[in-house]
Swiss-Prot record:
Residues 1-45 are annotated as: Disordered. Involved in the control of energetic metabolism and significantly contribute to cell fitness, especially under respiratory growth conditions. The lineage of its organism: Eukaryota, Fungi, Dikarya, Ascomycota, Saccharomycotina. Keywords: Cell membrane, Membrane. Residues 31-40 have a biased composition (Polar residues). It is a peripheral membrane protein. It comes from Candida albicans (strain SC5314 / ATCC MYA-2876). Belongs to the RGI1 family. This is Respiratory growth induced protein 1. One of its GO terms (biological process) is energy reserve metabolic process. Induction: Expression is under the control of RAS1. Up-regulated during colonization of the cecum and invasion of host tissue. Down-regulation correlates with clinical development of fluconazole resistance. It is found in: Cell membrane. GO terms for cellular component: plasma membrane.
Length: 201
């Protein structure tokens, strides 16, 4: 398509081994002001207060696209204000079916102990570590919490730490943020859903 602007992710392929970490924080981008709106205060009816609108949700169906999005948000100085969703078959699923989706066993879902073990390994040893490289700062999710229903299991992680920056530096630029990572699968398929949010505090 002529004249189509390429996104940074298309222009710069993802290379997890050569992403430079963030050394220092910077001021909040000026474009953020367009995301601030006024609403009536629930505490004091008749008065208005300013709130930051939630970031636009970006949807992905490939892990590399999702990781490139996270990397690009850091490069754009929006590392503390984004929301991405990923719907994908994890690498261990693709390997087991030799990249042929028709060969995915119907038993590969949340009811399979092996599938859950492989998914938990993928989350801890690959997904979180790769996201940390893409973010360019420390992620401190810990073990997380597992929430299970009859048809779904979700691993929930939160990071409200300083992400490796000093409190003085965070205060200087007013850059305090928390991260939320939810990874879930169902009893219907091997498809995994990831929801990753960076929220200013």
């Amino acid at each position: 398509m002529a004249g189509k602007k390429k996104s940074k992710s298309e222009a710069l392929p993802l290379d997890l081994d050569n992403i430079k970490p963030m050394d220092h924080l910077q001021p909040v981008p000026k474009t953020r002001s367009s995301s601030i709106t006024s609403i009536e205060s629930a505490d004091e009816p008749g008065t208005m207060k300013q709130v930051l609108l939630p970031p636009t949700i970006k949807e992905f169906d490939e892990l590399e696209q999702f990781e490139s999005f996270v990397r690009d948000e850091t490069w754009d100085n929006d590392f503390d204000y984004f929301h991405g969703r990923l719907h994908y078959y994890p690498p261990f699923v693709m390997k087991s079916c030799q990249n042929n989706l028709e060969k995915i066993k119907p038993t590969m879902n949340k009811n399979s102990k092996k599938f859950r073990r492989d998914l938990q390994h993928h989350i801890q040893k690959h997904l979180i570590k790769d996201l940390e490289k893409c973010c360019g700062y420390e992620l401190n999710f810990g073990k997380g919490e597992v929430v299970e229903t009859d048809n779904k299991v979700t691993w929930k992680f939160k990071d409200e730490t300083d992400h490796g920056f000093s409190k003085e530096e965070e205060d200087m630029y007013d850059r305090h943020w928390r991260l939320e990572l939810d990874v879930s699968c169902t009893n219907e398929s091997a498809m995994v859903d990831v929801e990753y949010k960076s929220i200013p505090m």
